Curated annotation (Swiss-Prot):
Family recorded in the similarity comment: Belongs to the sugar phosphate cyclases superfamily. Dehydroquinate synthase family.
CDD domains tied to this protein: DHQS (cd08195)
Gene3D superfamilies, per the entry: 3.40.50.1970, Dehydroquinate synthase-like - alpha domain
Free-text function comment from the UniProt entry: Catalyzes the conversion of 3-deoxy-D-arabino-heptulosonate 7-phosphate (DAHP) to dehydroquinate (DHQ).
NCBIfam families the UniProt entry points to: aroB
Top-level enzyme category: lyase
HAMAP family attached to this UniProt entry: DHQ_synthase (MF_00110)
Location in the cell: Cytoplasm
Annotated protein name in UniProt: 3-dehydroquinate synthase
Alphabetized SUPFAM superfamilies for the sequence: Dehydroquinate synthase-like
Catalytic activity: 7-phospho-2-dehydro-3-deoxy-D-arabino-heptonate = 3-dehydroquinate + phosphate
Annotated binding of Zn(2+), by residue: E184, H245, H262
Cofactor remark from the record: Binds 1 divalent metal cation per subunit. Can use either Co(2+) or Zn(2+).
């Protein structure tokens, strides 16, 4: 399956095909002429796919170099970005060369950020190997690194030249990482596609979903593609993709990156915001329970111990959706349809101080 993301200044294809990674050299050759290519990956993915990917690229005529960062959210930092700049300079990469992000969401965000800022921008490709990256973060051009203050605080919008998605990589993904991606799939269905919601309802468990991965990934990519085409720079409609993310990011930040995985934070965030939206008449009664039923089926968290209200408040009010003392909150009008509401930041405290906590 091939989907095209059509934007005013730059369009590119999403290739979704089981076994596509085995033909990565041919795919890259169809987009770029032989040149230097740097691969940024993490240590886990490198052990699984690094050598094979380099071999395929070299067979297609590319001169390759590879660097593997530590796996995990801690690598998504300005310090690691600096190391990558130095690596690219040592490899003498120029603006006529290219970079490939091979890995999950952390690698994609980090490598995209580095590509968009090294020499004021070089060409790059996304090759996501986790379910979360395949259905969400590899598409749309958002790149970022974290700081101690907030997740994704420093970043750019930079579109890749292409995205290659091979569902076979899910076979080597640990169950927790599969569930992370499922949280984003549930989010996508909840905000924009009731038919996908019904399809997810028909699946028995995570294994059943992975067995139908190409179909499910394609449906999510269509949602992301359609939203990004209408709002590339996150000024309006694209904000709906952040359903569950404001509180989710805050939970990740206050717990310490990696303690709560991104998908787990999104799962908790979707439940919390929908509980409040129901109380305020913004979402129909029963919407939270529909989410709980779906998320629990895939063994995603729906409750957690109360975190420090003040730390959560500070993290949320540093969220990039906060402007002029107002924060944009995404709520469900119904399953399959989301809307954006603006709230004064001080009202966020009411969200965090509900009886029973998050």
């Amino acid at each position: 399956m091939k989907l095209t993301v059509t934007l005013p200044t730059h369009s590119y294809d999403l290739t979704i095909e089981t076994g596509a990674l085995d033909k990565i050299g041919t795919w890259v050759r169809s987009l770029w002429q032989p040149q230097r290519v740097a691969i940024i990956t993490d240590e886990t993915v490198n052990k699984l796919y690094g050598a094979a990917v380099e071999k395929e690229l070299q067979a297609a005529g590319f001169e390759t170099s590879l660097i593997a960062v530590a796996a995990g959210e801690q690598s998504k930092s300005l310090e690691i970005a600096q190391l990558l700049y130095d690596f690219l300079a040592e490899q003498q990469l120029t603006r006529s060369d290219g970079l490939i992000a091979l890995g999950g969401g952390v690698v994609g965000d980090l490598a995209g950020f580095v590509a968009s800022t090294y020499m004021r921008g070089i060409h790059f490709l996304q090759v996501p190997t986790t379910l979360l990256a395949q259905v969400d973060s590899s598409i749309g051009g958002k790149t970022a690194v974290n700081t101690k203050k907030a997740k994704n605080l420093v970043g750019t919008f930079a579109q890749p030249d292409g995205v290659l998605i091979d569902p076979n990589t899910l076979k080597t993904l640990e169950p927790r990482r599969v569930r992370e991606g499922i949280a984003e799939i549930v989010k996508s269905a909840a905000i924009a596609d009731v038919e996908l919601w019904h399809r997810l309802s028909s699946l028995e468990n995570e294994q059943d979903l992975v067995a139908h991965a190409e179909e499910i990934i394609t449906a999510c990519c269509k949602i992301k593609r359609d939203v990004v085409e209408e709002d590339e720079l996150d000024l309006g409609l694209r904000l709906i993709l952040n359903f569950g993310h404001t509180i989710g990011h805050a939970l990740e930040n206050t717990a310490g990156y990696g303690v709560i995985a991104h998908g787990e934070g999104v799962s908790l965030g979707m439940i919390q915001i929908t509980q409040v939206a129901e109380q305020q008449g913004l979402s129909p009664l029963g919407t939270t329970q529909e989410l709980v039923t779906m998320l629990e089926k895939f063994h995603l968290p729906v409750t957690t111990d109360r975190w420090s209200e003040e730390r959560l408040y500070q993290a949320i009010t540093h969220d990039k959706k906060t402007r002029g003392g107002q924060i944009k909150i995404i709520v469900l009008e119904k399953i399959g349809q989301a809307k954006i509401v603006s709230l004064p930041t001080e009202e966020i405290r009411a969200f965090l101080n509900r009886e029973g906590g998050i």
